[in-house]
């Protein structure tokens, strides 16, 4: 079936010449690189917000019990918008939808600057919520890269996009520290101006360089299924490939946020310095994004199932290391294992998700999966502090073991189906 050209007029030429361009990317062959740049800009912006929003909230809040509300609204707004974002992308195309999402970051940053200048807490809440909207749209960057290529190249395309966060994960907190004092009379306003600039740059990059392309059908089998009636979401959700994708995306993100949120507090409680807690998180962020340079190649060499199981094993190593010792090297090692394990599970889980639907099923499947991931991440973020205070760091790590076990069982179930020659998707 031939997909009609979409987007701006220049893209029609891209569709005409697509067949003559080298695979795997055809007309959108630069899209993964463009999205990697956008991922870097997003990671810079969101890391500034995550670094300073709680402090800014404390500074502005009329009641200090509300100080963390602006921080929470980043995740809450993202969770509320993620389902809507999937259908907007289907209707308007990724180029325009992603640009609108990035524009919300620009507006949110400027609103935050204004609210700090005027000491308005509730307007600041609106600004951070708009950054949460940007986060919801940015989570689809990796899926956009995966959908544009055949099954063989999906994991590599996803890794390319996530690799954009490597430098940004380190640069973001550094930018936050540098820019927070740009305006001496308005502490933190300069940092949120940088957030607005990151959003504006993302808009320009997307509008000038990104190209909407028809989703790759991946194989002859997938091509035949593309012409079949769309399945219900319930039927898709019962397939082993979707179950395994959600198990890895949700478990990986939930465990990562649960441990990462508690780690700096636990380090200080174990008599390490506050600066050590911050350094542990930076090391963890390197672990999260640096494997993106080779995760796709590992999938091609060893297989998707092996990489997923390696991610689970690394998360288990994180828990075992944390339970064995509270020394500073143990914190560094545990958080490094956690970051790499998340990357393997996230790249692998996203690859499975991109294999679980046909083009007509894309919006609802992606939206539902991201909604589940956001909800689990929010739950982990909110629960980490109270559970750490009640049970302690080492017991906290025991709590992730059942989650990892469920993910391992779902992954093994999918792997057994693959070995038995089960058709995909079913």
State where each predicted segment sits.
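Helix-loop boundary and gating motifs at the non-cytosolic
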Residues: 21-79, 243-248, 256-273, 277
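Hydrophobic core of transmembrane alpha-helices in multi-pass small-molecule transporters
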Residues: 40, 121-136, 330-344
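Intracellular juxtamembrane helix-capping segments at the cytosolic ends
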Residues: 53, 136-149, 344-357
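Helix-to-loop junctions at the C-terminal end of transmembrane segments
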Residues: 81-94, 290-304, 388
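C-terminal ends and interior cores of transmembrane alpha-helices
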Residues: 103-118, 314-326
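C-terminal membrane-cytosol helix-exit motif in multi-pass small-molecule transporters
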Residues: 177, 196-220, 410-415
């Amino acid at each position: 079936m031939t997909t009609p050209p979409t987007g701006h007029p220049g893209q029609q030429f891209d569709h005409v010449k697509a067949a003559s361009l080298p695979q795997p990317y055809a007309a959108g062959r630069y899209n993964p690189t463009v999205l990697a740049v956008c991922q870097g800009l997003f990671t810079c912006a969101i890391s500034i917000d995550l670094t300073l929003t709680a402090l800014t909230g404390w500074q502005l809040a009329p009641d200090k019990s509300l100080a963390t509300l602006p921080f929470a609204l980043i995740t809450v707004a993202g969770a509320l918008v993620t389902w809507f974002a999937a259908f907007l992308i289907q209707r308007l195309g990724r180029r325009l939808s992603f640009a609108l999402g990035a524009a919300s970051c620009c507006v949110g940053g400027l609103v935050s600057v204004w609210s700090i200048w005027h000491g308005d807490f509730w307007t600041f809440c609106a600004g951070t919520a708009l950054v949460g909207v940007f986060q919801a749209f940015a989570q689809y960057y990796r899926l956009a890269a995966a959908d544009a290529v055949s099954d063989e190249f999906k994991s590599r395309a996803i890794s390319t996009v996530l690799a954009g966060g490597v430098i940004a994960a380190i640069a973001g907190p550094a930018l936050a520290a540098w820019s927070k004092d740009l305006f001496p009379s308005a502490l933190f306003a300069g940092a949120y101006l940088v957030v607005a600039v990151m959003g504006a740059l993302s808009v320009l990059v997307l509008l000038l360089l990104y190209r909407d392309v028809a989703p790759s059908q991946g194989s002859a089998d997938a091509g035949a299924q593309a012409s079949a009636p769309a399945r219900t979401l319930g039927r898709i959700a019962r397939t082993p490939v979707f179950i395994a994708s959600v198990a890895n995306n949700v478990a990986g993100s939930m465990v990562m946020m649960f441990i990462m949120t508690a780690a700096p507090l636990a380090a200080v409680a174990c008599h390490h310095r506050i600066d050590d807690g911050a350094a542990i998180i930076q090391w963890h962020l390197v672990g999260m994004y640096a494997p993106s340079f080779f995760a796709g190649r590992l999938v091609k060499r060893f297989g998707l199932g092996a990489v997923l199981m390696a991610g689970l094993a690394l998360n288990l190593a994180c828990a075992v290391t944390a339970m064995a010792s509270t020394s500073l090297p143990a914190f560094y090692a545990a958080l490094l294992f956690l970051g790499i394990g998340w990357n393997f599970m996230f790249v692998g889980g996203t690859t499975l998700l991109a294999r679980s639907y046909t083009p007509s099923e894309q919006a609802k499947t992606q939206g539902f999966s991201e909604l589940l991931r956001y909800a689990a991440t929010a739950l982990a973020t909110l629960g980490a502090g109270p559970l750490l205070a009640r049970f302690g760091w080492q017991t906290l790590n025991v709590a992730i073991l059942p989650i990892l076990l469920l993910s391992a069982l779902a992954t093994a179930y999918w792997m057994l189906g693959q070995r038995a020659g089960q058709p995909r998707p079913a």
